[in-house]
């Protein structure tokens, strides 16, 4: 009864007011799966292609009617009659039919929406929650954990209209005993941060990922105000709550230098910027740094890994773009020690699971992540639990596109109880 009988694609709106692709997969037994593709702002150059129409008279060129047409046309034709439970087979048909290295014919947004909708339909057909089905697809049935959230409470870079160069300043409630408690701790710090910023006469408007986006005197000041908020909330920094950053350094890499415009155009070499970050880790309990250099600066990353890699988690996002070919090369060259996992960078569930497995097999951690352009689709919560990835990045404590994922984690934890432990600090590379 898990035979696909109908596939529907449609254009919906994401959290930035831009169109994205939503797909429905209908099965013979009456079960339906529905999923939407997210969209990034700071994107790696080697990501799978997000197909946009380019018609400036409609959605400023960002329409996705071509990708939707691919779902309703060739993809639907190829998949009708196939077994939804064969996720790898379904994804392979779409990838082969597209025939390009970066999914540029149909768009990764089209293929991913169908891939995830198919997984949801198959889970429904099997009478199980999505996380349980994902664990089976992953070859790890019944093995779950609740992820430590990385909560992006100060937004900068491409995610905010402010003068802060580093894109994300995050808290990790590592001292919590459950994900529900971790979310409460994050919420309390978030609200205390608003009070701290207001007391300093700073803006408390939020950025794309729901964190505050004030103008600050320096990148270090973001860490200082967060430290103040953690203390005001009654928590101990470094014990109850640790810090993480996403530099998204490719966004301020210009002519071979790392230029911090918000700090008077200070320019750094790869080595100098590594030591700039190292100093911050000495001043604050920063346990994870993502994209600490430009995605193409592999020599710099090798140096950064040598300097910081045995002390903290170094996460590759633009660096690896959830791509097993690139990750394999990084593992062989000893670049970073963790990978950020974003479905739409690679464009299918099967390839996403392959990247998580490769990372884990090599002793790298995997951090499951949203994109800055999101929808109410909470699939990443199920992915994090179903692969026992251990960490999740899904924004701050505001905007329902972010909070939807936290609420799903609360529901999953309630359902699984002790079968899905919250392991806190030991999930983070170098912190066990």
Curated annotation (Swiss-Prot):
Output one GO BP term: glycolytic process
Q: Which residues form a coiled coil?
A: none
Q: Does the keyword Cytoplasm apply?
A: yes
Name of the top EC class for this enzyme:
lyase
Q: How is the cofactor bound?
A: Binds a second Mg(2+) ion via substrate during catalysis.
Q: Which reaction does it catalyse?
A: (2R)-2-phosphoglycerate = phosphoenolpyruvate + H2O
Give a short account of what the protein does. Answer: Catalyzes the reversible conversion of 2-phosphoglycerate (2-PG) into phosphoenolpyruvate (PEP). It is essential for the degradation of carbohydrates via glycolysis.
> Mind telling me what this protein is named?
Enolase
Q: Which organism is it from?
A: Shigella sonnei (strain Ss046)
Organism ancestry: Bacteria, Pseudomonadati, Pseudomonadota, Gammaproteobacteria, Enterobacterales
Name the gene for this chain.
eno
